Swiss-Prot record:
<comment type="similarity">
    <text>Belongs to the ERT1/acuK family.</text>
</comment>
<dbReference type="Pfam" id="PF00172">
    <property type="entry name" value="Zn_clus"/>
</dbReference>
<keyword id="KW-0804">Transcription</keyword>
<dbReference type="InterPro" id="IPR001138">
    <property type="entry name" value="Zn2Cys6_DnaBD"/>
</dbReference>
<feature type="compositionally biased region" description="Low complexity">
    <location>
        <begin position="174"/>
        <end position="193"/>
    </location>
</feature>
<dbReference type="GO" id="GO:0000981">
    <property type="term" value="F:DNA-binding transcription factor activity, RNA polymerase II-specific"/>
</dbReference>
<keyword id="KW-0479">Metal-binding</keyword>
<feature type="region of interest" description="Disordered">
    <location>
        <begin position="174"/>
        <end position="198"/>
    </location>
</feature>
<dbReference type="GO" id="GO:0008270">
    <property type="term" value="F:zinc ion binding"/>
</dbReference>
<dbReference type="GO" id="GO:0009267">
    <property type="term" value="P:cellular response to starvation"/>
</dbReference>
<dbReference type="GO" id="GO:0000977">
    <property type="term" value="F:RNA polymerase II transcription regulatory region sequence-specific DNA binding"/>
</dbReference>
<keyword id="KW-0010">Activator</keyword>
<feature type="domain" description="PAS">
    <location>
        <begin position="408"/>
        <end position="480"/>
    </location>
</feature>
<keyword id="KW-0805">Transcription regulation</keyword>
<keyword id="KW-0312">Gluconeogenesis</keyword>
<dbReference type="InterPro" id="IPR056751">
    <property type="entry name" value="PAS_13"/>
</dbReference>
<protein>
    <recommendedName>
        <fullName>Transcription activator of gluconeogenesis</fullName>
    </recommendedName>
</protein>
Amino acid sequence: MCTPDENDYKTSTDPDTSANTNHTLEKKKRKKRKNTNVACVNCSRLHVSCEAKRPCLRCISKGLTATCVDAPRKKSKYLAGIPNRELPMSIQPDLPPRKIMIPIYNNSSNSSLNVNNMGEQQKFTSPQHIVHKAKFLSNAADSEYSILSNIIYQDTLSNKIPIDILYSNTNSTSNSTIGNSSNNSPTGTNTSPEETEMEKIRQLYSEQRANMPPHPYPSSNQNVYSILLGPNSAKIVASQVNLFANHFPLVPVDSADNSLNFKRLLPRDPSEKSSQINWDSSINQYYLNSETVTFPELAIPLKRRKNHLVSVSLESCSPDAANIKSNVGWEHSLRYSTPMEIYTSINAPFSHTPGFHHLLVYLKHRFNQQDLVKMCRSIAEFRPIFIACSVTLTEEDMIFMEQCYQRTLLEYVKFIAQIGTPTCIWRRNGQISYVNEEFEILCGWTREELLNKMTFIVEIMDDESVRDYFKTLSKVAYRDFRGSEKMKVCRLLSPIKGKIIHCCCMWTLKRDVSGLPLMILGNFMPILN
């Protein structure tokens, strides 16, 4: 038998028993830590506890409400290089923290505004929140990064502030004013987040265009948009608004005779029907051109002869039509026809910010919230690549990028004129930059209608093709560097309402010297069966 001393010795040296005992003792010693709040300046100076509410109860009792603000904290390493006067002031609403609400997707604008308001109020209930973005060396890169951030974070006010405004000393008062207005108003700010966003971005790129010469109104000579911009086309044309800085989407029109006579201003022969189809019955072949008969007008004849082999031929054009078409007033398109003019005349970078902004607004009006989130995710993949490629680029580098774009476009235009394939070229923000005559014949939209204003490639696609567009964009531009991708089915919208052109589209991506997507070339071929 074991003596009592031996039993005590065994119990104390048992590893399992000793571990359980130590764990129990640690539990007793360990107590729940209280959540600590950032003390105000007055409480921090006296080393007393404080609360999250501003002004705190102690400052109210002492009459120090005017100076009751958060005490400055030690800056993080990533903020070490930024002076204190340039750091944005934190916005502290006087509202209690609200419960997190799951937004309900709704197409109505009122519900989206309410969701944005809730997101903004929740974002700034944390007193430790610090707004910070990477500082680019180029203003053009700054503004483009800001609009990309705005697309990704739709419910966050801090990410809607462009970086130039964020680091501007003159706007620190406006930032604090936003916070004060949220304190005084029981439901938040008086202006909606979308209005605030549009106002800030409008100020951003209006300054960039201040020194530019005024653009002539695109439709001053020929009224091509009098019926192509929806029900308010006449008002838009009469207002003389700048269609390069403001976006109005193209809208297909009902045509009783399934032709484009409603938009042909100068037919070849006024005594004849401008859309009289030229057809050779002996070989069952149709003849098309960009002025009288286009491919959308063949929808009904092709449907009648769907069981027969049909060929389509393009009528030969005059030698003058093959000349390079440039326009100095079209900043987004080919501006000059010689390399010397490109290198000597382009002295400012092209701003993609207005294009991204208006693209987002257009998608909001056209698609529901669920589709919009998926599209924004595809655009969001561009942001880290944009930071890596352009954070060290200067303003001179961005000017050189635009010169490279114009020089590359000039060479491609010469090549495209020889191959005869319907081709459309657009920038990385989706803005159409160039189309050839074959593309005009295929889709029915003329070159002037597409390039005489801010037009996006997604405007002339149906809904399903737009969804595939952003998926293809993320593949070809951000995931792999093969430089080409194929859309098996791309449905183009024609000016005739209800007439859709089924095509197969091959993408070719061209990058600049820094690796950023420079331009996208789309070759479209119709699917006849």
